Amino acid sequence: MALHWKLVIDTADAPALADFWAQALGYEVEDPSALVEQLLAAGRLPAEAVAEHRGRKHFRGFAAVRHPEDPYDPFTGIGKGRRLLFQDVPEPKTVKNRLHLDVHAEPGGLAELVARLESLGATRLREEGQGPAGHWYVLLDPEGNEFCAA
């Protein structure tokens, strides 16, 4: 049986990094505001566990993005398919990622993809390969997490 999964990424500012990756991937930022409001009203969530971003309440220190074509719970906003969850952590990133995302350009569109990602806040680190593995760029997201565009 195949398992459902999500990739969890440690951050300093979960909502901001979710915004970047939603734009970079063409994903939707999840909106848990209805669930947050319900939990607040029922006294099951303390006010200090809630923050607001772009006019919507969310769980403090967390944000997620999901593929726009994948199923999701319309009340909670939580995706049931391809999903990235960002969680705030107190320590800064200090070493290279052991896991990273590769984003793929349309044929012939790598330069345009890299330029678009840079316009969203990514930083180009280096260009790699021209051999059998192909041609790609290593970039950093706004918090310094490595990813590749190929």
PLM features: residue spans?
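Vicinal oxygen chelate
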Residues: 2-9, 19, 23-25, 31-93, ...
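Helix N-cap motif at beta-to-alpha junctions
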Residues: 13-14, 106-109
